[in-house]
Amino acid sequence: MSRYIPDDNLSYPVLISIGGRSGSGFYLNANDGSYLVTAKHVLFEEDLKNKKFTLWDKTVTFSSYSKDPTEKTPLVLNANLELVEVKTHPVFDIAIVKVSIFKEKTPEGMWITEFIDGITTKQIGEKHFTVGVPLNSCRKYEDIQVSNEIFVFGYPNSLGIHEKSQEDNELDYSRPLLRKGIIAGKNDLKRTIIIDCPIYQGNSGGLVMECEQVNFERKFFALGVVTKFIPFVENMKSLQYGTVNTSIENSGYGVVVPVDTILEFIQKEKQAAT
């Protein structure tokens, strides 16, 4: 029986662990190598008063599985952030970390990669390489169709009750979860995508894939990265005392930064380094 989503797509989610916290990310294959993409707030703590960002820790781990759902052991990379440069977007809540460089292609068309300085293998999984979103699977912002089906990949660690024993948990927090929704709209002024799909703590930085039906065939494209949920704000005023209580809840909508914005950012950083 075939799977609804292509097998390789299940390899894209990356669990990011840093400073006792966790978030989501994914690997993106650019022309020169593979990059870890996530939301900036997954790696950085924001000082709202001074408008400064500080890394949650000096080291971070990236954990990912292969396309085989029976795989027991993930590939875990360790990144020394004192050696590896983290680039943050000046406008969007986006951070990238270059993980490896492409050396040459095998006869089968696979890239032979080499991890850059500061990236080491902490645990070798049943797959010995990272699986990144290829460029030909990236959807441009201008081509995104409102109402199309989407899937959010990530590690929503805020769901469920964390028991002392992993066996007692309803969820396996070491594995990604998928969430299905639709493209609800586009904000052309901000150049962001609005999705009708609940986003929870831990989903930030995760990949969003768009599903398009072409001639009775499903095709999947990388849409962008989840950065936050859109809040539902309700102000309740007491008629007796005149006080106002503000309630903020998850509206079920989320914000996605398009993948071509990320690719443009990578290209600018490469040009600035030369």
Features from the language model and the residues they span:
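Hydrophobic alpha-helical segments and helix pairs
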Residues: 77-132
